[in-house]
Regions:
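A short helix->loop->beta-strand "cap" motif at the edges of active sites that frequently abuts
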Residues: 103-112, 121, 189-192
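Non-cysteine beta-strand/loop elements that form the S-adenosyl-L-methionine
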Residues: 38-42, 111-115, 139-150
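Conserved phosphate/ATP/ADP-binding segment of small-molecule kinases
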Residues: 127-255, 265, 284-296, 304
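Charged C-terminal helix
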Residues: 290-397
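Glycine-rich phosphate/adenosyl-contacting loop at the front of the ribokinase-like
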Residues: 1-59, 379, 385-397
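Glycine-rich, highly charged phosphate/nucleotide-binding loops
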Residues: 55-74
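Short pre-catalytic strand/loop immediately N-terminal to key active-site residues, enriched for Gly-Thr
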Residues: 17-18, 256-271
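Short, small-residue alpha-helix embedded
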Residues: 268-290
Length: 397
């Protein structure tokens, strides 16, 4: 085997022919930032499942093993970084896990970002249940994990009592339960770094953290005044939720946790978590200590790119689709009253042509992340999304 190449990434996740999820959401951004990306596709689908209809096939465990064997035989497993995402079945995930373990044994410094793609709040588990224990076993191999709220709550194990019911896992609805989940993951699974991509917490809780507002680079992209589909950070009733991203490292037996408050866009998008994980991998440099430690630096840079691309994608979708799904171009900075319909309203509206079977597909197509068109946002220099280090002693007192 050749020596590890600093700029070479192995990305193991889903592939779609049309759209930007999985490897399609990760590869181009990583290449834009100068990485050489080798891709293993765990599925080959026509498009993502949000379209309502998709076709294609899953890569079998035997096929995955054959691909890894071919790479190894030719001395091509020289990757210094690995990213894994959606793997649909337990047997296939087991093959992937065994390959990662071999790579970590050969190169302990290999940076591994694990996105344990299992499900989402409101959707539930969308992989086979027997995948979950394999993911739990793979946590020990990861440098960084990037789960969403559902996945965090699913992989935490100790019981929590709520409404006289015994729940399996930690339901994160407060700073105390967040702290408990972080401690468990760091200590029981020897995880050095955790990036919770988004956790909804009540405004009343988030307001105690004194988190910075979005940066100027983001605000300048917004229409003025703010349109109704955009919820600014911290605006609303005390019991309403704010999305917060948390970056936590375990340093000398102590949590070093940073928090980043995120605005909310009322819309449906796919591939956001895949893009976020890729950007965290790209910007994570273990030796970095200034101006931020390695993980909050990577998360800060990732959030700025992802949040800007998400906003530009939403503005584009609003400017190109009316209730019929037909193209109705409008300027990106149109007056708020011209962009009031939400994605849910546009999807449920009576179409002008009800016999058009592709109406939903047209709506989904214009919501695909604009990673190519907005590539300048990926490679931009400068600061990232502002965050704040948490003082756990004070917060839990």
């Amino acid at each position: 085997m050749l020596g590890a190449e600093p700029g070479r990434v192995l990305s193991i996740q889903s592939h779609v022919v049309s759209g930007y999820v999985g490897n399609r959401a990760a590869t181009f951004p990583l290449q834009t930032l100068g990485y050489d990306v080798d891709v293993v596709n765990t599925v080959q689908f026509s498009n993502h499942t949000g379209y309502g209809y998709t076709n294609g096939h899953k890569t079998t465990p035997e096929q995955l093993a054959a691909i890894f064997e071919g790479l190894a035989t030719n001395g091509l497993i020289t990757h210094s970084r690995v990213l894994t995402g959606y793997v649909p079945g337990a047997a296939a995930l087991q093959v992937v896990g065994e390959q990662i373990e071999k790579m970590k044994k050969d190169n302990p410094d290999c940076i591994y970002v694990l996105d344990p793609v299992m499900g989402d709040v409101g959707t539930g588990l969308y992989v086979s249940p027997d995948v979950v224990p394999i993911y739990k076993d793979m946590l020990r191999l990861a440098t960084v994990i990037t789960p969403n709220q559902f996945e965090v709550e699913y992989v935490t194990e100790f019981p929590v009592r709520a409404d006289d019911r015994l729940l399996s896992g930690v339901k994160i609805d407060s700073l105390a339960t967040l702290h408990a989940a972080l401690i468990q993951l760091h200590t029981e699974h020897s995880l050095p770094h955790i990036a919770f991509s988004s956790i909804p917490l009540p405004i009343s809780v988030v307001s105690t953290l004194s988190l910075p507002a979005p940066p100027h680079q983001y605000d300048r992209l917004l229409p003025t005044p703010h349109p109704p589909w955009f919820n600014a950070v911290g605006v609303g009733a005390p019991d309403e939720d704010v999305l917060v991203c948390f970056a936590s490292s375990f340093v000398d037996g102590q949590l070093d946790t940073w928090a980043f408050a995120l605005p909310t866009i009322d819309g449906y998008f796919s591939g956001v978590g895949d893009l976020f994980s890729a950007m965290v991998l790209a910007h994570f440099h273990p030796a970095q200590t200034s101006p931020l430690p390695a993980l909050p630096h990577a998360v800060s840079k990732a959030l700025l790119a992802v949040q800007q691309i998400l906003l530009r994608t939403h503005l584009y979708s609003l400017s190109h689709a009316g209730p019929s799904g037909a193209a109705t171009p409008r300027p990106l900075h149109a007056a708020p009253e011209s962009v009031i319909p939400t994605d849910a309203e546009l999807d449920s509206a009576v179409p002008l042509n009800p016999k058009d079977p592709r109406r939903k597909a047209k709506r989904m197509r214009i919501r695909e992340l604009r990673v190519v068109q907005e590539r300048a946002l990926i490679s931009q220099d400068g600061v990232g999304w502002p965050g704040q280090r948490l003082n756990w002693s004070a917060l839990l007192a």
